[in-house]
Structure formats: C-alpha cells, structure tokens
Amino acid sequence: PADLSALSRRMSDRHFGIGADGIVVIMPSDHCDFRMRMFNADGTEAEMCGNASRCIGKYVYDKGLTSKTQLTLETLAGIKHLILDVKNGTVNRVSVDMGNPILFVPKIPVNTSLSEIISYPLEIENNTFNITCVSMGNPHTVIFLNEMERYDLHHIGALIEHHELFPKRTNVEFVEILSPDHLKMRVWERGTGETLACGTGACASLVAAVLNGKANRKAVLHLLGGNLDIEWNEKNDRVYMTGEAVTVFEGEWNNNI
C-alpha cells in the first residue's frame, strides 16, 4: 500500500491490529543489497532501527532472498553493514556496523548554542536530570540513574521526548551502571513509548557512558527484551551492535478489513 504510515498505525494497534512497536518494510535498493523503511506505531517514519536491521538480516537469509552472510542495508541514516551468524541453515545472531556516533548538536539536533551536550542539567518538573545527547542516525537523550525503579519513566520519558530542546523530538534512554562492562537500560522511544529494546538506543547509551567515564568501550547492555553486545571501537570511532534475531510468528494481513 502507498500509505505505509497509516498501515503502521493499524498493524501496530494491540487491540485492532497485530500489536507492535512499528513496521519495517524491506525494499530493493539501487546500491545496496536491500533497503529498509521503518515506521513507528504512531505512523511517523524513523531514520533507522538497529533491532529491525537485525530482523531484516534474519528474514532475507532465512527466506532465501539472499545467500550472503555479509549484507549492506540502505537506510535514511546511511548504509549499514550486517554480518549474519548462521547455524543449521538459519540466522542465530546478527552484528551490525552502526556507524559513527554524532555528538555535534546541530546534527542531532538540539536547540542550544552549545556544540555538545554531555552531562547537561535539564530540569523536568522540579527534578534535574543530567542528560547526554547522541545521534546514531536518530536522536537519543541518555540519562544515568541509580535505582531507576524509583522513577516514573513513562511520565519523564514523554516530557523529555516533547521538550522544546528537541525540534525533532528525541528517544530517551534511562541507564543504570551495574559495572563498567554491564549496563541496565530502559528506553522511551520517540513516537512509540516504552519498548522492550532499542538497538540505536543501546549504542547511544554506551557512547554516553564512555563519554561520562562510567563504562568501558565494550559492554553488555541489559534491556527488558534481552541483551545486546555493544562496542565503540576506539580506532575507527564506529559502534558495533550484536544480538539475537528470533522469528516469533508468521501470518497474512488483509488490508481491506
């Protein structure tokens, strides 16, 4: 269908649709193996989605659309490189080169005269949170908390997502440092709300943790939906994400209903 935004809203609805954080469309590309478009549950289009890119890698290989185990994927955030870990004829894990983190404020973007936002105090309803802003092709605002269960993350996340600082809104990551190589993360996604995982958010969280002296350049991110291995390579400044990709179910959608 031409209106992918409306389709995403219908399919993502947990009462009248399938129920999802959004939809991912796999398309042909003129200069990559495949092209992806990602639409959030509210119908807005995202630049890319790290977790969706892993799902695409599994889908195209398992469905026989490619026999390659190294793929290029065209996204609105640039070309992403995927490495597929294949066992017994199916993809088990996928590693994605997520590219270089963007810290320059106009490129994120953030409404401020500062060039970078690292541990910047932001007041939200009489509470001050130190935020670090990173783009992984889409905007992220990372906040470090101790005992994050004490906070109403849905309320805070929504307020920050729509804060006047962020002209294109922002994803919000709440991170608790368990150790320098183990981080606990919850995410409030722009246009969707809290989700079980966010690949670009996990990458942004590790970058922010390193910038604030809280983590090593390689760490495990513990999310509600599972774990992701994230590395910010010091030599080439690129961030790499590795995680599982699992088929949950298959079905057909009647768009005439």
Label the model's feature ranges:
Residues 1-90, 141-257:
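A glycine-rich beta-to-alpha transition motif near the start of alpha/beta enzyme domains, typified by
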Residues 71-73, 117-124, 134, 219-221:
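Short acidic-hydrophobic surface loop/beta-edge motif
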Residues 82, 128-133:
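Short, surface-exposed loop motifs enriched in S/T, G, D/E and P with embedded aromatic residues
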Residues 93-95, 99-101:
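Membrane helix-loop-helix hairpins that form the core translocation module of multi-pass transporters
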Residues 100-102, 136-140, 245:
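Glycine-rich beta-alpha junction loops
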Residues 102-130:
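Active-site glycine-rich loop that binds ribose-phosphate moieties when present
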Residues 131, 139-142:
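Selected transmembrane alpha-helices and immediately adjacent juxtamembrane segments
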